[in-house]
C-alpha cells in the first residue's frame, strides 16, 4: 500500500510516517518546507521520500499526487494557530489552507480513486453543554475562524468523495512540535505556581497512539466520521496539568481558575470538547490507550532539557 501523507513536519504527520514504515507500507511525505524540517530523531520519517508541496496550489497538488498515485492520502496538514487565525489579514490564508487545500486534495483523490483521511477537530461544534459530541452529529456551529475553516474542509471531503475517513481529535500532543505539555513543562520549571482553566472539558490525543489507529483504519473500508482521542475519561486543562507535573516530578502548584478569570483569548474556546468515541469499537477498531498512560509514555521520552 502506497500512502501520501501531508503535514509530515508536524506532530501527527511525523508519527503516521513512522507507523507506515513499521508496518512495511510505502509512505511518501509532504509539507511546505523545501525539505523535511521536523525533528531529526533518526526515525523512519527523517529518511523517507519527501516532496515539497503547497496544498493551496491546485495545479501542483494535482500533478504531484497524480504522478505518485497513492492508494491512500492521509491529510494532516492544516493551519492550527487558533488565535492568529482571527487576525483580519490571516483569515483568507487560513481558509485557503484548511478549506481550499483540502478541496484540492479531495479532487485529486477522487480522480485517482484513492482513499482519504481528513483530520478534523471538535471546534466544528459550538463547544456548549456537557453531552459528548457524536461523530455523526451534523449540528455544526463553529465558534471561531479555525473551526469554521476546518468544517469547510470536512464538507469538501464528504461532498467530493465516498471513500473517506473524517477523524476528529482534540488537545493534541506529540514529539514533533509545540503542544500544551511542552508549554506547561517550560512554565512549571520556572514558576512556583501556575493558573490553569478548569471549566473547559475534553480528552488529550497522543499522536503516536492516533497514528496506529489511522493506519488500522486505512487497512479497511469502514468509511465515515470518527472521534479518536485517548481513553481514560473527560478532564479539564487543570486536571491535565496536574498529571503532567506529577509524571515529570514537578512540585509546581496548579491553581484552578475559570476561563473568565483566566482572561479572554482572541479566539473563543469550547467549554465542551467531549468526543464520543464508541463508534471505533463498534466498527472493530481498537481504541487508543488511556490519556494517563499516554502522558506518562510521552514524558518518559521527552528530552526535558530541550523542550
Language model: regions and residue ranges:
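Amphipathic terminal alpha-helices
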Residues: 291-307
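Conserved glycine-rich Rossmann-like NAD(P)H-binding loop of the short-chain dehydrogenase/reductase
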Residues: 25-37
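Mid/C-terminal beta-alpha module of Rossmann-like enzyme folds, strongest
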Residues: 190, 213, 220-265, 271-272, ...
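NAD(P)-dependent short-chain dehydrogenase/reductase
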Residues: 155-202, 208-209, 216
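NAD(P)H-binding glycine-rich loop region in Rossmannoid oxidoreductase-like domains
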Residues: 55-97
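Catalytic helix-loop patch of NAD(P)-dependent Rossmann-fold dehydrogenases
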Residues: 92-104, 124-167, 172
Amino acid at each position: 500500500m502506497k500512502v501520501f501523507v501531508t503535514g509530515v513536519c508536524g506532530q501527527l504527520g511525523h508519527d503516521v510516517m513512522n507507523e507506515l514504515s513499521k508496518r512495511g507500507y510505502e509512505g511518501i511525505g509532504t509539507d511546505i518546507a523545501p525539505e523535511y524540517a521536523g525533528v531529526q530523531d533518526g526515525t523512519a520519517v527523517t529518511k523517507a521520500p519527501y516532496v515539497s508541496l503547497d496544498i493551496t496550489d491546485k495545479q501542483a497538488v494535482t500533478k504531484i499526487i497524480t504522478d505518485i498515485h497513492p492508494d491512500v492520502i492521509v491529510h494532516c496538514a492544516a493551519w492550527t494557530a487558533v488565535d492568529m487565525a482571527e487576525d483580519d489579514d490571516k483569515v483568507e490564508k487560513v481558509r485557503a489552507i484548511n478549506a481550499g487545500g483540502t478541496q484540492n486534495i479531495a479532487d485529486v483523490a477522487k480522480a485517482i480513486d484513492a482513499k482519504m483521511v481528513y483530520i478534523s477537530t471538535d471546534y466544528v461544534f459550538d463547544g456548549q453543554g456537557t453531552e459528548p459530541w457524536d461523530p455523526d452529529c451534523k449540528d455544526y456551529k463553529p465558534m471561531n475562524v479555525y473551526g469554521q475553516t476546518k468544517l469547510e474542509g470536512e464538507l469538501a471531503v464528504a461532498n467530493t468523495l465516498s471513500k473517506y475517513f473524517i477523524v476528529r481529535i482534540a488537545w493534541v500532543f506529540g514529539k514533533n512540535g509545540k503542544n500544551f505539555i511542552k508549554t506547561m513543562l517550560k512554565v512549571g520549571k520556572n514558576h512556583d505556581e501556575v493558573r490553569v482553566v478548569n471549566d473547559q472539558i475534553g480528552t488529550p490525543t497522543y499522536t503516536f497512539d492516533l497514528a496506529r489507529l489511522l493506519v488500522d483504519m486505512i487497512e479497511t473500508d469502514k468509511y465515515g466520521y470518527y472521534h479518536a482521542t485517548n481513553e481514560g475519561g473527560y478532564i479539564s486543562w487543570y486536571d491535565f496539568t496536574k498529571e503532567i507535573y506529577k509524571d515529570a516530578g514537578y512540585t509546581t502548584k496548579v491553581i484552578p481558575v475559570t476561563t473568565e478569570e483566566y482572561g479572554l483569548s482572541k479566539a473563543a474556546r469550547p467549554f465542551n470538547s467531549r468526543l464520543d468515541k464508541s463508534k471505533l469499537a463498534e466498527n472493530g477498531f481498537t481504541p487508543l490507550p488511556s490519556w494517563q498512560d499516554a502522558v506518562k509514555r510521552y514524558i518518559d521520552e521527552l528530552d526535558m532539557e530541550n523542550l
